[in-house]
Amino acid sequence: LATSIIYKSTLLYELVMVALYGRHYASRYRAIADLIPARASVVDLCCGPALLFSRHLRGKNVRYTGLDVNAGFVEGLIRAGGAGQVCDLRKDEPLPPADYVMMQASLYHFLPDALPIVGRMIAAARRQVIIAEPVRNLTTSGSPLLAKLGRVLTNPGMGEQSHRFTEESLDELLSVYGSQVEKSFLIAGGREKVYVINAVG
């Protein structure tokens, strides 16, 4: 399956993300970094070019492992001093354990049934799961051209993704965790919603 051009280069990836998020681009990473204490261990699912690590977590001595289907991104992460693994997270396999298991802007890849991957994250987390997911998306635009552009630009090599979350559908999905949810809040000018879910036990 053809990979979107933005997943072929960290520079292109970042240019598109800056265009999408504008002045909120940097703050979306800071919001997640602020949830992770120094010297914690982190597993980041669908980590992309791992900018969260290189710009925010490396300086906090966080033990970071990024998982992604894109070998180029994983190689770049390893060169930057993190640990990385190339893997297809759609396979039903246990995730590496860590204090914090997180995913930013990638849960939609697992639609129409995203609960199993969240369950695997909960099973791997010693402290908390952090999920940040876009709830305002190009693919839900009323313009067919913009919607198509959103699907094409967000294919990491697993096929075009037509399904996306709204705030309501994300809330509904994660409501099954009830009192395990420590908090939820919007970031990036309301474009993404963050859920912090406590580990079991």
Give names to the regions the model predicted.
Residues 102:
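A conserved beta-strand element that flanks and buttresses the S-adenosyl-L-methionine
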Residues 110-121:
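A short, conserved alpha-helix within the catalytic core of class I
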Residues 132-176, 182-185:
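C-terminal alpha-helical "lid/dimerization" subdomain adjacent to the S-adenosyl-L-methionine
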Residues 7-26:
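Class I SAM-dependent methyltransferase Rossmann-like catalytic core
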Residues 22-39:
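Conserved alpha-helix/loop element of class I SAM-dependent methyltransferases that forms part
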Residues 49-91:
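Class I SAM-dependent methyltransferase SAM/SAH-binding core
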Residues 106:
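Hydrophobic adenine-recognition pocket in adenosine-nucleotide-binding enzymes
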Residues 40-48:
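Conserved class I S-adenosyl-L-methionine
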